[in-house]
Regions:
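C-terminal interaction segment
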Residues: 1-60, 65-124
């Protein structure tokens, strides 16, 4: 993913593009128009993902939704842009919660997101 305003490349864990991808340069390796970006947080990247990286992503005109998934517990942060340009925040913290996307018609329970995750394993 290329962000021309900051002259910055990054590789999100997941991204969703609406309609046709727009590419940087003549190749077809690097897109510039992510609608939704999902990052799985680790202890080493979580602060960066929440601050500078989110700032870089917000420079993409098509970007409307940012999902941060904690890998150590049931916890998902959702940021989405309203029509007036303001960003709203929602946190889901229970295995009974459902993540409902605002930019596309899709939802997924946290139980499904965290399926087969063993929270008792320690980070190495």
């Amino acid at each position: 993913l290329w962000m021309p305003r900051y002259r910055f490349y990054t590789y999100p864990d997941v991204m969703v593009i609406k309609d046709k991808p727009l590419y940087e340069g003549k190749g077809t390796n690097t897109v510039t128009n992510a609608l939704i970006i999902v990052e799985v947080l680790s202890k080493s990247t979580r602060d960066y993902d929440r601050t500078d990286k989110f700032k870089f992503y917000r420079s993409i005109p098509e970007f409307k939704e940012y999902i941060l998934i904690d890998q150590y517990r049931y916890y998902v942060e959702q940021f989405y842009q309203q029509n007036n340009g303001e960003w709203l925040f929602k946190a889901s913290e229970s295995d009974k919660d459902t993540l409902r996307f605002n930019s596309v018609d899709f939802q997924m329970s946290l139980l499904d997101i965290y399926q087969r995750i063993d929270f008792n394993l320690t980070e190495e």
